[in-house]
Regions:
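Double-stranded beta-helix
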Residues: 15, 181-245
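Short, conserved beta-strand element in jelly-roll/cupin
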Residues: 165-183
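Hydrophobic side chains in beta-strands
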Residues: 146, 176-177, 190
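Histidine-centered catalytic micro-motifs
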Residues: 155-162
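Conserved hydrophobic/aromatic beta-strand scaffold that supports enzyme active sites
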Residues: 22-24, 173-177, 243
Length: 245
């Protein structure tokens, strides 16, 4: 098993998840598994061919327009690479090595990479989903997010159900820290209990008229699932990276 033990959530943990919309489980993955995942990330860097890449940057509303080109939209069952916007100079040239410039690798790691598949699809994850009320859970997407030293851009507050929409809302996210992630280097942060207070106000959809993507406004109540929790990832102005998958 990739986990320390084939665990079940305790009643206290389930109550904490339902109350806060998030549950932290320390030391969930074995240390050797974390090391192998970080090694695999380096291997993925080595396979990257910059000459065949459209130089797609991972953009959010903070950058003016959310990413939405063909390379991004066709990444659900592939391993695609997305750059930090600040890794380029004013002429569009990379100013750092590739392994210090990538923001995200995704979104089909659980399909094409055995290392990431092993932490996504296994009996422990399935058991946790069952305890939280899921009857037929499916892995939708997987990614590695890298907060690069000095240029790791901020991701604004949002809910995952804006991007991974179902009705009723049922998306559940699992985040695994692969390095020491802190407020200084852009860790994941949530607004505790926000899944009980907010309505879904917008959805991320394809723009069939102009191409790319856009947000459309909606007004729907949010259900009690992890994807409804407001969360953000701060910028990394520190000289130490953070990674999570």
């Amino acid at each position: 098993s990739v986990c320390h033990l084939n665990m079940r959530l305790s009643p206290t943990q389930i109550n904490e998840f339902e109350k806060n919309g998030c549950l932290v489980i320390p030391n969930f993955l074995r240390l050797d598994v974390v090391e192998s995942l970080n090694y695999e990330i380096e291997h993925l860097y080595s396979k990257f061919d910059i000459n065949k890449h459209p130089m797609t940057k991972f953009m959010t509303e903070i950058n003016g327009k959310h990413i939405g080109n063909k390379y991004f939209l066709e990444s659900s069952d592939k391993i695609h690479y997305f750059f930090e916007p600040d890794a380029f100079d004013s002429k569009g040239m990379l100013t750092k090595p590739v392994d210090k410039s990538i923001n995200k690798i995704g979104h089909g790691l659980h399909i094409l990479d055995k290392n990431f598949k092993s932490i996504t699809i296994n009996s422990t994850i399935s058991e946790i989903c069952t305890q939280l009320g899921y009857r037929d859970p499916r892995a939708l997407q997987s990614m590695v997010i890298i907060k690069q030293p000095g240029i790791g851009n901020e991701v604004p507050p949002h809910t995952d159900s804006e991007f991974l929409y179902t009705n009723p809302v049922t998306c559940l996210g699992f985040w695994f820290a692969l390095e020491n992630c802190t407020a200084k280097n852009g860790c994941l942060q949530i607004i505790s209990g926000s899944h009980k207070m907010h309505t879904l106000k917008k959805r991320f959809v394809r723009d069939t008229e102009k191409g790319g993507t856009k947000f459309v406004h909606v007004n729907e109540p949010l259900k009690n699932w992890n994807s409804n929790v407001d969360h953000e990832k701060g910028e990394n102005s520190w000289q130490k990276s953070s990674k999570y998958t």
